[in-house]
């Protein structure tokens, strides 16, 4: 999978507005891509940070690529995976999510000095 494939998969005609099937599909897609990287030696896994606001359920997805020096503060890279209404959202923000997925894939095989946290934010 590459960046273009990820953008295409995320920027569909369903949109990714919170509470829609497209939003749920985007979350499942990101989780699937992260799970496919789990076998990599330096990817410590991912977790979901679920919350509820205004009657809606939200879920931030976080993955850490651990570094050697735990005394150094981690670097945080993030992008939101929801979109407004039924818009496909290639530029808002599927492209940035695709870049984060590629960063996870590239860093998963690297031994880093500093930890990196990748955050896929919900609305």
Model-derived segments and their meaning:
Residues 1-4, 17-28, 90-98, 110:
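Soluble non-cytosolic domains of exported or imported proteins
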Residues 2-3, 54-57, 68-71, 110-113:
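Extracellular/periplasmic catalytic domains that process cell-envelope and extracellular macromolecules
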Residues 5, 37-39, 71-75, 112-117:
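Loop/turn elements at helix/coil->beta-strand transitions in domains of secreted/extracellular proteins
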Residues 5-66:
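A non-catalytic alpha/beta surface segment that caps or lines the substrate-entry region
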Residues 17, 48-49, 68-70, 81-85, ...:
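Solvent-exposed loop/turn segments at secondary-structure junctions
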Residues 63, 77-123:
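Alpha-helical metal-binding/catalytic segments enriched in His/Glu/Asp
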């Amino acid at each position: 999978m590459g960046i273009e494939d990820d953008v295409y998969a995320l920027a569909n005609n369903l949109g990714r507005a919170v509470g829609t099937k497209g939003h749920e599909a985007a979350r499942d897609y990101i989780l699937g891509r992260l799970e496919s990287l789990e076998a990599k030696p330096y990817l410590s896994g991912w977790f979901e940070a679920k919350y509820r606001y205004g009657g809606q359920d939200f879920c931030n997805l976080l993955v850490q690529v651990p570094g050697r020096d735990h005394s150094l503060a981690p670097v945080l890279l993030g992008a939101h995976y929801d979109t407004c209404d039924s818009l496909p959202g290639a530029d808002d923000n599927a492209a940035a999510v695709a870049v984060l997925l590629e960063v996870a894939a590239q860093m998963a095989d690297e031994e880093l000095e500093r930890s990196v946290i990748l955050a896929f934010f919900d609305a």
